[in-house]
């Protein structure tokens, strides 16, 4: 055997699919005898003020109470918010960083978001960049998973598609935010956050000057060059500034996930 990849030895990649429809399913549903007693690990906690690339983001410290519980208190927020986390999961005898199997988010006991990775559709792949803070990944190389359902996505693994992860925080009210994270072997971690509602803590960013509207075609024309964006090229509004520099066009920054490329 020869290993031609970046790992330390020969290995096998495989996937399992349902015969009807060729839908990929979670291989952990089968008796693979993989030892796993390790809980998901949480690195950072974030609140967002909206669902698109212009929403404000704020990071809050977490304190690890014990092996399974993280907490944070004294957080103030207002309006509609949703959650982001930097996290990973590992199995015994492996240092590979995996994603989690399922997540549930509740505010004062009411569930606002829930997903479970039993299967995944090939159609889900075009929405995958909506599950992360794409701008954060491109500018700071940090992968933050976002726990909300973007209006443009239609993930097959969402448990209740009527729960989009947005929670309304009202001034003068107190809230308990409880997040449950699980791997397939039922190793769980919990995040317990206490919030107080005030006015305008997470403000929506100001309107941009070079907005591309998703419902319109946009073309930037110069003397001998042009750039054309077909409508629905992006999942939401994008602030794209195009510069003509001699024989080169500089087309904005890669901080907006594209629907069509």
Where are these predicted regions, by residue range?
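Flexible, gly/ser-rich surface segments that form the specificity/activation loops bordering the active-site cleft
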Residues: 1-11
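Short beta-strand elements
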Residues: 174-176, 184-211
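Extracellular recognition modules
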Residues: 15, 178-182
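Short, solvent-exposed loop/turn segments at the edges of extracellular beta-sandwich modules
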Residues: 3, 92, 182-187
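Compositionally biased low-complexity segments at domain edges in trafficked proteins
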Residues: 39-64, 204-237
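Exoplasmic/lumenal beta-rich domain surfaces
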Residues: 64-71, 99, 105-168
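Proteolytic processing hotspots in large secreted/extracellular or virion-associated proteins
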Residues: 202-205, 241-261
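Acidic, glycine-rich catalytic/binding loops that coordinate metals and/or anionic ligands
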Residues: 15-89, 94-95, 124-133, 172-173
């Amino acid at each position: 055997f020869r290993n031609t990849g970046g790992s330390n030895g020969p290995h096998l990649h495989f996937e399992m699919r349902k015969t009807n429809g060729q839908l990929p399913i979670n291989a952990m549903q089968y008796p693979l005898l993989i030892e796993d007693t390790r809980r998901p690990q949480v690195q950072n906690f974030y609140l967002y003020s909206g669902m698109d690339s212009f929403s404000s983001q704020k990071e809050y410290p977490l304190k690890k109470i014990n092996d399974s519980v993280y907490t944070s208190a004294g957080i103030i927020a207002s309006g509609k918010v949703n959650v982001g986390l930097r996290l990973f999961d590992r199995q015994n005898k492996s240092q590979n960083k995996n994603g989690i199997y399922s997540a549930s988010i509740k505010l004062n006991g009411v569930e606002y978001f829930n997903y479970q990775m039993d299967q995944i559709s090939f159609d889900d792949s075009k929405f995958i960049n909506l599950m992360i803070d794409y701008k954060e990944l491109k500018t700071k190389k940090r992968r933050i998973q976002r726990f909300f359902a973007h209006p443009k996505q239609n993930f097959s693994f969402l448990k209740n598609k009527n729960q989009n992860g947005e929670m309304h925080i009202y001034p003068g009210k107190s809230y308990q935010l409880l997040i449950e994270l699980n791997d397939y072997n039922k190793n769980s971690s919990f995040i317990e956050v206490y919030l107080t509602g005030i006015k305008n803590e997470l403000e929506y960013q100001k309107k941009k000057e070079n907005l591309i509207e998703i419902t319109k075609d946009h073309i930037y024309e110069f003397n001998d060059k042009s750039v054309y964006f077909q409508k629905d090229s992006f999942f939401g509004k994008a602030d794209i500034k195009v510069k003509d520099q001699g024989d080169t066009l500089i087309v904005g920054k890669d901080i907006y996930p594209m629907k069509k490329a």
